[in-house]
Curated annotation (Swiss-Prot):
Domain of life: Bacteria
Protein's organism: Escherichia coli (strain K12 / MC4100 / BW2952)
Family indicated by similarity: Belongs to the dicarboxylate/amino acid:cation symporter (DAACS) (TC 2.A.23) family.
The name this protein goes by in its record: C4-dicarboxylate transport protein
Compartments it resides in: Cell inner membrane
Keyword Chloroplast attributed: no
A GO cellular-component term linked to this record: plasma membrane
The keyword Acetylation appears for this protein: no
Residues that span the membrane, as ranges: 8-28, 44-64, 76-96, 142-162, 184-204, 222-242, 297-317, 326-346, 352-372
Record lineage: Bacteria, Pseudomonadati, Pseudomonadota, Gammaproteobacteria, Enterobacterales
Entry-linked InterPro entries: C4_dicarb_transport, Na-dicarboxylate_symporter, Na-dicarboxylate_symporter_CS, Na:dicarbo_symporter_sf
GO biological process: L-aspartate transmembrane transport
Length: 428
């Protein structure tokens, strides 16, 4: 029993995170030097994301009997994303108004260091809706894979899958090659995941070593407000959706606990993307659904990021005593409904989208970003964790809506009654 516990990735990552926190706290200079370990692990994962998405989407679409099903799945997924992310924005808005973490700070925007956030504000100017849509279309296929742009790779994979499906039996050889290549890719993922404890240790040691516990205490009310909101969203909103779909959110969280710990250690939900693709398929969701919903969700279904954006924007307004009546808050909500959809595939994405939102709203000081620059890293964990759980739930819900969910397999796996690989007939 003890041997199996020590060998489990869950235990190893959890232990690595704890050691990283202790090292960063007691030996901050050494902790900061551990940054390459975390960065290296995330880069290894990002290296494999593009081929994983390509193989999963192509084999999923090309293996379907009807192309109409793909379009239906995409439409249902986008509808679900819009509804749930809007709920996330509204919940964030309600909680931050009730708690008011920025009230009483009385910060003069003129005293803030605008230079500290200038790089984010400059990048935000390029994050318009048209620019976002145009960015989905790659200048070249090789460029899309080289840059690791998820949506660009997804677009090419969907087109490739459609074209391969139209070839029929003539394309069977290509289909078999891609399917075999997919197995090799997942073999590489299994090797990379053995390094997860090292990556989690390095990332956590760096974070605590560089920013320290004092940063947490300084703006602790905002951090606590954000974490509580994320927990409430997962338990109440996603929990209710899960219950209506026929599964327990807590059992699902237990099922993806290793992925959650990896995300906690690296603060990047992308670090768990390859394993989530595999795990959601083993949970009973059709490969074509998983291949469309998970990658698309990384741009259109970022529930944690949506909560962060509303709370951070209103916090800045409260801290700087900027006017924020009901009209301004509705305006903020409308702007965020659009700007939050561009939060993926951009370095410092949440922060950049927040800068773009403050600029678009107009009456909120962009320099106010300096208030949360130091603690943004500590809130990124909750963002990434909530995003991951949200995309997992979305995959199951969409699979059920389009009747591509194996209910028996879902129930068996979540209740530990069957091996992950066992198959059952689909039910509607």
């Amino acid at each position: 029993m003890k041997t199996s516990l020590f060998k489990s990735l869950y235990f190893q990552v959890l232990t690595a995170i704890a050691i990283g926190i202790l090292l960063g706290h007691f030996y901050p200079e050494i902790g900061e030097q551990m940054k390459p370990l975390g960065d290296g692990f995330v880069k290894l994962i990002k290296m494999i994301i593009a081929p994983v998405i390509f193989c999963t989407v192509v084999t999923g679409i090309a293996g379907m009997e009807s192309m109409k099903a793909v379009g239906r799945t995409g439409a249902v997924a986008l509808l679900y994303f819009e509804i749930v992310s809007t709920i996330a924005l509204i919940i964030g808005l309600i909680i931050v108004n009730v708690v008011q973490p920025g009230a009483g700070m009385n910060v003069d925007p003129a005293t803030l260091d605008a230079k500290a956030v200038a790089v984010y504000a400059d990048q935000a100017k390029d994050q318009g809706i048209v620019a976002f849509i145009m960015d989905v279309i790659p200048a070249s296929v090789i460029g899309a894979f080289a840059s690791g742009n998820i949506l660009q790779v997804l677009l090419f994979a969907v087109l490739f899958g459609f074209a391969l499906h139209r070839l029929g039996s003539k394309g069977q050889l290509i289909f078999n090659v891609i399917e075999s290549f997919s197995q090799v890719i997942f073999g590489i993922i299994n090797m990379i995941m053995r390094l997860a404890p090292i990556g989690a240790f390095g990332a956590m040691a760096f974070t605590i070593g560089k920013y320290g516990v004092g940063t947490l205490v300084q703006l602790g009310q905002l951090i606590i407000c954000f974490y509580i909101t994320c927990i409430l969203f997962v338990v109440l909103v996603l929990g209710s959706i899960a219950k209506a779909t026929g599964f327990s959110i807590f059992k699902f969280i237990r099922y993806i606990r290793e992925e959650l710990l990896i995300v906690l250690g690296t603060s990047s939900s992308e670090s768990a993307l390859p394993r989530m693709l595999d795990k959601m398929e083993k949970l009973g969701c059709r490969k074509s659904v998983v291949g469309l919903v998970i990658p698309t969700g990384y741009s259109f279904n970022l529930d944690g990021t949506s909560i962060y954006l509303t709370i951070a924007a209103v916090f800045i307004a409260q801290a700087t005593n900027s006017q924020m009546d009901i009209v301004h808050q509705i305006t903020l909500l409308i702007v965020l409904l659009l700007s939050s959809k561009g939060a993926a595939g951009v370095t410092g994405s949440g922060f950049i989208v927040l800068a773009a939102t403050l600029s678009a709203v107009g009456h909120l000081p962009v320099a106010g970003l300096a208030l949360i620059l130091g603690i943004d890293r500590f809130m990124s964990e909750a963002r990434a964790l909530t995003n991951l759980v949200g995309n997992g739930v979305a995959t199951i819900v969409v699979a059920k809506w389009v009747k591509e969910l194996d209910h028996k397999k879902l129930d068996d796996v979540l209740n530990n009654r069957a091996p992950d690989g066992k198959t059952h007939e689909l039910s509607s």
